[in-house]
């Protein structure tokens, strides 16, 4: 009898209540996610799952998101949306599915409204119009960080441009520079004999940029990088045969995709960015 009680107590300790926290945002959702995390640490005995849905900017994307999360039990929806048209479906969904929901922005907007005796609807509209360029850049920068280095294949489908390239072809700094121009950029490092995400083949080839370089230039850059880390510069990473194989593999993929290719050897990232923007016929606001 004593053993059974002990086992029951042990089972109670190991079984955790599952909570699915859904983060929905019209931007990267970092604020909503950070708030959810800060709250969730107060419940160490709960099994908390975070499911993030960033850049939900229209009703179609929101509908798909709500349809997807319907499968999860014990929902807590944390959302950050400026557009009321996108807030209402979330509230309706939450009520119909008996889910808890938290609006990150409205309490702050309401507090400012009460303090200033101003109507938030007019203020938000005017502010958005005046600072649209700024917010687009911030959103693009957050996007570039979130989808850097192939972290999440879903980003490829949402991006304005996707950069492909072997290691040390300036993918990340180029992504950030283009993001500062207002473009949503995702990038993927290419390594021979590794799986290419299916999403890459679903993208319009005109949105894909294949980065390449000269073998000797890449060899020099990689050797210098190893030396800066206090490591042996003569490794497979900087070996000319390996470099040639990597570049050949990348070029074969670019040919298969039919994408635009840029040789970044001896080019500044500003020059490369200009070539990409010209290719996309993109003009900065």
Curated annotation (Swiss-Prot):
Top-level enzyme category: transferase
This protein's record includes keyword DNA-binding: no
Reactions accelerated catalytically: N(tele)-phospho-L-histidyl/L-threonyl-[pyruvate, phosphate dikinase] + ADP = N(tele)-phospho-L-histidyl/O-phospho-L-threonyl-[pyruvate, phosphate dikinase] + AMP + H(+); N(tele)-phospho-L-histidyl/O-phospho-L-threonyl-[pyruvate, phosphate dikinase] + phosphate + H(+) = N(tele)-phospho-L-histidyl/L-threonyl-[pyruvate, phosphate dikinase] + diphosphate
InterPro entries, alphabetized: Kinase-pyrophosphorylase, P-loop_NTPase, PPDK_reg
Alphabetized GO MF terms: ADP binding; ATP binding; phosphotransferase activity, phosphate group as acceptor; protein serine/threonine kinase activity
Residues that, per the record, bind ADP: 165-172
Superkingdom of source: Bacteria
EC number: 2.7.11.32, 2.7.4.27
Entry keyword set: Kinase, Nucleotide-binding, Serine/threonine-protein kinase, Transferase
Pfam families: Kinase-PPPase (PF03618)
Function: Bifunctional serine/threonine kinase and phosphorylase involved in the regulation of the pyruvate, phosphate dikinase (PPDK) by catalyzing its phosphorylation/dephosphorylation.
Family: Belongs to the pyruvate, phosphate/water dikinase regulatory protein family. PDRP subfamily.
NCBIfam families: PRK05339.1 (NF003742)
Name this protein carries in UniProt: Putative pyruvate, phosphate dikinase regulatory protein
Species of the source: Lactobacillus delbrueckii subsp. bulgaricus (strain ATCC 11842 / DSM 20081 / BCRC 10696 / JCM 1002 / NBRC 13953 / NCIMB 11778 / NCTC 12712 / WDCM 00102 / Lb 14)
Higher taxonomy: Bacteria, Bacillati, Bacillota, Bacilli, Lactobacillales
């Amino acid at each position: 009898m004593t053993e059974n009680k002990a086992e029951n107590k042990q089972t109670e300790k190991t079984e955790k209540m599952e909570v699915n926290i859904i983060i929905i945002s019209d931007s990267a959702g970092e604020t909503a996610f950070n708030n959810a995390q800060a709250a969730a640490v107060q419940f160490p005995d709960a099994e908390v799952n975070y499911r993030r849905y960033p850049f939900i900017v229209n009703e179609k994307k929101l509908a798909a998101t709500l349809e997807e999360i319907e499968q999860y039990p014990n929902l807590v929806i944390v959302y950050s949306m400026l557009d009321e048209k996108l807030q209402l479906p979330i509230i309706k969904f939450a009520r119909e599915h008996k889910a808890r929901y938290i609006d990150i922005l409205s309490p702050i907007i309401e507090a400012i409204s009460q303090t200033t005796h101003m109507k938030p609807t007019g203020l938000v509209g005017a502010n958005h119009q005046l600072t649209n360029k700024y917010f687009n850049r911030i959103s693009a920068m957050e996007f570039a960080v979130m989808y850097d280095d192939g972290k999440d294949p879903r980003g490829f489908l949402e991006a304005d441009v996707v950069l492909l390239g072997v290691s040390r072809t300036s993918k990340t700094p180029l992504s950030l520079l283009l993001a500062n121009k207002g473009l949503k950029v995702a990038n993927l490092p290419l390594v021979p004999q590794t799986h290419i995400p299916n999403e890459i083949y679903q993208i319009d080839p005109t949105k894909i940029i294949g980065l390449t370089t000269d073998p000797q230039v890449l060899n020099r850059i990689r050797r210098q990088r190893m030396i800066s880390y206090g490591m042996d510069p003569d490794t497979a990473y900087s070996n000319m045969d390996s470099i040639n194989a990597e570049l050949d593999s990348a070029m074969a993929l670019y040919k298969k995709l039919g994408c635009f290719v840029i040789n970044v050897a001896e080019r500044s990232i500003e020059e490369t960015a200009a070539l990409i923007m010209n290719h996309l016929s993109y003009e900065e606001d």
